Amino acid sequence: MVGKQLLHLSARTTFKARFIAQPEPFWGNFGIFEDSLPNGYGLYLLNRLLKKQGVNDMDLTPIQRLSIIGCSGMGALCYIPETYIGEEKSLPDLDDLQQMALDVLSEKSNKDEDILYFNSGNSGGCRPKCLFHDTEGSWLVKFRHTYDPKDMGLMEYRYNEINLFCSQD
């Protein structure tokens, strides 16, 4: 009986409140959804892929951008229907992936954006990265950028060790 009363009540109720996203700070999108979109490195790759297909990134609406993310984003949200950009390709050797990222970022190559984008999890941030899965779990692997020193990974590892040491009780 309660379910019928609620249904009857909701059928007669109209909601007049509307929320319209403003142009700032999220380009006509709401923060909860904007957080799903790539920025930095991921946006750079996406723009290059779209350009190859003759699409200007600036002409896309927030809904079109979210449909490109589909179910491949890092968060819990999934956007359907999905719009597929590029081709699904398997993850190459991590050293090869690092070199591909450096070549694309330095604009020496324009052939590997789809491999990098597909395996990036639509990443944010400025550094190249990929999602890697093995028997021990899932990993976010960060690579160095063209302006990073060659031992950047070792430096980040050492900072992590210091952080762990300082966090001990």
Residue ranges and their predicted role:
Residues 1-169:
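Phosphate/dinucleotide-binding and metal-coordinating scaffold of catalytic cores
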